[in-house]
Amino acid sequence: MLLMVVSMACVGLFLVQRAGPHMGGQDKPFLSAWPSAVVPRGGHVTLRCHYRHRFNNFMLYKEDRIHVPIFHGRIFQEGFNMSPVTTAHAGNYTCRGSHPHSPTGWSAPSNPMVIMVTGNHRKPSLLAHPGPLVKSGERVILQCWSDIMFEHFFLHREWISKDPSRLVGQIHDGVSKANFSIGSMMRALAGTYRCYGSVTHTPYQLSAPSDPLDIVVTGLYEKPSLSAQPGPKVQAGESVTLSCSSRSSYDMYHLSREGGAHERRLPAVRKVNRTFQADFPLGPATHGGTYRCFGSFRHSPYEWSDPSDPLLVSVTGNPSSSWPSPTEPSSKSGNLRHLHILIGTSVVKIPFTILLFFLLHRWCSNKKKCCCNGPRACREQK
């Protein structure tokens, strides 16, 4: 009996020793920001302190565990809504959660989390090289640049809670820029990206966001088919429709043109022949060129199929293989207009030249007669 009591006491002591470091503050919680730690000035963010399960009570610290004045002496429950966010809120944060059974009553501090406040400088630009459509496994470079001399650039993917990627800006030809490399494209890296810039003395006060850039991973599903109605060669001014179809049940089709800045998208419609199709009307005034289409599903809009085989659309009788824009006159109409101007100008100039020649000829004839008859005749003529 005594041996059993001693054994239970040893087990209890062992459990206390194991629990002590966790409940006594050695097991770190983590601090989260929702919807994102990158917050526009005037926006809002909710901070929560977690440890396995969310703490009922927690305290917030900013920069080296110093209380922010609005946090001083306050214990938060569930979460803290920071609104409206100002530049004063930018910086490093940690939290401590309450542990009723720990000696100190509080956990160890969490790892720091950075709150970045945006909208403090003019937005930079974001480009993808070689382009925003990236085949699975291939490399893409996202370049953030600005004519403002930013010391650092940040790249952030929407709806991702982790801190943005950060690079030092390189100055070249009066432009500050940074190249963010994605070495091997995969599903997890596709999405909408924005970039920001910051200056040295305020590293967590960022510029306005760049325009959004959608990075799409392709080559994940079988390719659809692309055809032209009435055909890939049409008469000038004739309408043409491009049809993208597949037996795969794609929800959306995307049409891209080589050299085009934007793709067009249309929902797929199920046809009686059990194919899923979308018809893209180009109309008589859109450009010809080489087209491809892709398919995607509703639940993964940034994950596309292999591209269809390329389809060259051209205009017969037009050497440029493209239709003129409604706001741009064709070369033929421009030449005719130039010819009309030349003809009109010539009609005015020819009679004027004849009249000038006639007057000059008459003047010379009178002068010749004057010289033949002598000075007296000339004076009489005057």
Curated annotation (Swiss-Prot):
The keyword rRNA-binding does not apply. Residues 22-340 are extracellular. Glycans are attached at N92, N179, N273. GO terms for molecular function: MHC class I receptor activity. One of its GO terms (biological process) is natural killer cell activation. SMART domains: IG. It is found in: Cell membrane. Expressed in NK and T-cell lines but not in B-lymphoblastoid cell lines or in a colon carcinoma cell line. GO terms for cellular component: plasma membrane. Interacts with HLA-F open conformer; this interaction is direct. Receptor on natural killer (NK) cells for MHC class I molecules. Upon interaction with peptide-free HLA-F open conformer, triggers NK cell degranulation and anti-viral cytokine production. This is Killer cell immunoglobulin-like receptor 3DS1.
